[in-house]
Amino acid sequence: MSNLEASYNLILNNLREISGIEDFYFKPIKPKLSDIELISLIILAEFKSIDSEHQLFREIKGFEIGPNIERSVYNRRKRKLFPFIEEIRMKMVDKLNESENYFIVDSMPLEVCKISRSFRSKICKDVDYAYPNKGFCASQNLHFYGYKLNAVCSISSVFQSFDISPASVHDIHYLQDIKLQMSDCVLLGDKGYLSQTIQLDLFKEVNIELETPKRKNQKDYKPQFYQFKKYRKRIETLFSQLCDQFMIRRNYAKTFQGFKTRILAKIATLTTIQYLNKFLFGRNINNLKINLI
């Protein structure tokens, strides 16, 4: 058995234990490869940085599951499994973030194509509600065309929740979504989330204390607590890992459904490796560039 197949079996056994279900939705003809086996294959591909499906099917040719699925079916079923991958991810997150009270919110740009090609590009323009558009990332001083990944992570570097918005949407609007997902915690953000109205609203509605650094020209200015500044770097490190190891900025999807499924697959893989590191291997959860077998 190859190292790759052994890693696949390890991921599969743990995901089976977490989900407790083999198939998640009805199929008139039962496929040879179950849904949980397919999700394990998706996680393996992202962990090994195999971003080409053609390359993935060459790699698994000698696997026991190799003849059980075709490439076209793999892609179609992968998109249908989007809500179930997120469901499994949330089960892992609930265990990893069980005793967390401090979280960090931030965003990063997801470029679909260069601005010069944006007028003739047809990528992700298949649905009206999710058209990509032009935006600006202040931290990188970057004008880009595409989407923003808005995310919340714990101080132990586990993504609690995330969302994708068009590039032009201001970061602060994501806080309205957070209100429906979280409560009774401290949320750390940068100056982009500075708003007294939203700060009061979050506290009154769901008891979330929003902590942001204040601008130097504000009347009640005082430097932010040093430990909070240090915590805020955690999410930036996570974004760097998504870009480096999981190649989140490399996009081959043509539809929005395909695009968001790729993003979820990468974040779910990150969470899976963190889960295995903590509960199976007993090591630092953020040792991501490490062999499973």
What is the meaning of each model-derived region?
Residues M1-I293:
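Short alpha-helical elements
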